[in-house]
């Protein structure tokens, strides 16, 4: 699926008219085109399924891990992303993502983890789904069932409208495999996360 920038331009022009403004006035003439171009960039992830993203970033390194390394956690944290809430199209911002996995013969390059988080966030999203999508893609790429994703962020639908509570943070956690059932692993994960 590709993003239809011409349709976006047309509809943004209609929104400007519906708001009671003149889309042909100076300052707004190029706005529909600028918004369409911005949407093409910030919603780039909508062009790809989770399978597509997994294929994009599937370069891994095969490692012969010893049994003593079975509980070694790889954690990449403080990955900054932004997204847009699918309910109000408002910005989800000041978002940080932490992705952890226990390697199972395949190691992924650390920058690929950040790229996966970035691509998944470039969709109309829910914070909970961002975590689920990242975990699903990580499982496909690394073949590890043991994945954890922690996300913190602010939501424009809470800070700029409705209840208007700036600074309210939403935290979500997606746990798969042993992270879901092994309290000692979760304790180890949280110690790494807070370090």
UniProtKB/Swiss-Prot annotation:
The keyword Secreted does not apply. It catalyses: GTP + H2O = 7,8-dihydroneopterin 3'-triphosphate + formate + H(+). Its EC number is 3.5.4.16. GO terms for biological process: one-carbon metabolic process; tetrahydrobiopterin biosynthetic process; tetrahydrofolate biosynthetic process. GO terms for molecular function: GTP binding; GTP cyclohydrolase I activity; zinc ion binding. GO terms for cellular component: cytoplasm. Zn(2+) binds at residues 85, 88, 157. Pathway: Cofactor biosynthesis; 7,8-dihydroneopterin triphosphate biosynthesis; 7,8-dihydroneopterin triphosphate from GTP: step 1/1. Keywords: GTP-binding, Hydrolase, Metal-binding, Nucleotide-binding, One-carbon metabolism, Zinc. It holds the Pfam family GTP_cyclohydroI. Gene3D superfamilies: 1.10.286.10, 3.30.1130.10. HAMAP family: FolE (MF_00223). Belongs to the GTP cyclohydrolase I family. PANTHER family: GTP CYCLOHYDROLASE 1 (PTHR11109:SF7), GTP CYCLOHYDROLASE I (PTHR11109). Toroid-shaped homodecamer, composed of two pentamers of five dimers. This is GTP cyclohydrolase 1. It comes from Clostridium acetobutylicum (strain ATCC 824 / DSM 792 / JCM 1419 / IAM 19013 / LMG 5710 / NBRC 13948 / NRRL B-527 / VKM B-1787 / 2291 / W). The gene is folE.
């Amino acid at each position: 699926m590709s993003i239809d920038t011409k349709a976006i331009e047309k509809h943004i022009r209609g929104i400007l008219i519906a708001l009671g403004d003149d889309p042909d006035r100076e300052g707004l003439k190029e706005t529909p085109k600028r918004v369409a171009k911005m949407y093409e960039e910030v919603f780039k992830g909508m062009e790809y399924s989770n399978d597509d993203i997994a294929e994009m970033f599937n370069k891994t390194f095969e490692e012969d891990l010893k049994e003593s390394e079975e509980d070694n956690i790889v954690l990449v944290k403080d990955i900054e992303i932004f997204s847009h809430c699918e309910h109000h199209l408002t910005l989800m911002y000041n978002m940080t993502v932490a992705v952890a996995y226990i390697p199972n013969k395949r190691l992924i390059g650390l920058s690929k983890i950040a790229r996966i988080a970035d691509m998944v966030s470039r969709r109309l999203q829910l914070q909970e789904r961002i975590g689920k999508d990242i975990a699903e893609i990580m499982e496909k790429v690394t073949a590890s069932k043991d994945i954890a994703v922690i996300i913190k962020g602010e939501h424009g639908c809470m800070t700029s409208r409705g209840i208007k509570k700036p600074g309210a943070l939403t935290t979500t956690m997606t746990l798969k495999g042993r992270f879901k059932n092994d309290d000692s692993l979760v304790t180890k994960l949280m110690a790494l996360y807070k370090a």
